[in-house]
A protein has these predicted regions:
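A glycine-rich, often tryptophan-bearing local segment used as a flexible ligand/cofactor-contacting loop or short
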Residues: 1-46
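Short, low-complexity, polar/charged sequence segments that are solvent-exposed and flexible
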Residues: 20-22, 36-37, 88-89, 106-111
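Extracellular ligand-binding/catalytic regions of CAZymes and related secreted enzymes
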Residues: 86, 94-130
């Protein structure tokens, strides 16, 4: 399982372990809702539920969508969290702690109160069941 930079490691620039897919910088993608890599809470859809999740220049998983199962997407529809066989990748930070949202102060209202930790645990359980 790779989160943020850990997900990038699965891509063609690094270990190249994905079948028919790549991990690419989300801020460079068509239709992205952000062009800046700085920490922020961005809109994602995780299994049908819209969330604001901590983002810090994370990756999108692109390629043949029949080769992986998409668990979450970014606002532009790119895959943000995927499972491919025994590989699980997440571009944002569901593991984020409350302290991550303290600076800058405008992010304080976006802390998830642990909801994202539950999403991450469910994701890990799905991955281990593969």
């Amino acid at each position: 399982m790779g989160i943020c930079m850990g997900a990038y490691w699965a891509g063609q620039e690094y270990f190249d372990i994905l079948e028919g897919a790549d991990a690419v910088q989300y801020i460079t993608r068509p239709g992205t809702d952000t062009r800046r890599p700085h920490p922020k809470a961005i809109d994602i859809v995780w299994q049908g539920q819209t969330e604001k999740m901590f983002f810090y220049d994370g990756c999108a998983i692109v390629g043949d969508a029949t080769k992986f199962r998409t668990v979450a997407t970014y606002a532009n529809g790119d895959a943000m969290a995927v499972i491919q066989k025994r590989i699980g990748l997440i571009g944002c930070h569901p593991e984020s702690e409350e302290s991550w949202y303290q600076q800058p102060s405008w992010m304080r209202t976006h802390y998830h109160d642990g909801r994202h930790h539950s999403l991450l645990l469910n994701f890990a359980n799905q991955l281990m069941a593969q």
